[in-house]
Amino acid sequence: LVTSDAHPGLVRAVSEVFQGAAWQRCVVHLMRDCARAAGSRQLSRRVSRIVAPVFRLKEAGAVRAAYHLAVDMLGSCCPEAAAVLEETEPDALAYLDFPPSHWKRLRTNNVQERANREIKRRSRVVQVFPSASSLERLAGAVMCDMDEAWSDARYFSEARMAELYDERQRGANGEPLSEEQLEGFRLVARQAIEASLQLADMLEAA
């Protein structure tokens, strides 16, 4: 699984270099794209309040139900944001195919964003580069340092990685969800989004 924003060049590079890998669209960037589609600041805040709770839910069924509900709710107040959300569903929810304990690290590209911030921080010290190659050397040095740090660190423990195998085994033998289970997920989804909107209304009224 490769996680990134939806920049066309990145998406194309992932498909060419990591053939067969799934692609996860960073949900933070997705929420920003939805909010940007709203136009006005007030509507943008409402869009964010509808979308954000979707990715905080802890069960895959509830996340999917909330995603569909968010698309429906956005359709009545901001069709542009609804179109963005609906179009990207398979890529935005790719992380749900992995164990829940992995979700927090898979659904955003925070690791890459931290690397970008470090390059910006180091380049601000220099301010003016004499050539493009000097900038490339600095960025390359930063990435080499990070690669060394990442190679010594364990992102997931062995127990967490074992969960992935167990999850795949259960998925292969899993039963489809009943209508009662689906309705329960829809209820959880509605409660989560409505609670987020109520909190927003209370904060604006205060």
Predicted regions mapped to residue ranges:
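Catalytic center-proximal scaffold of phosphoryl-transfer enzymes
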Residues: 1-206
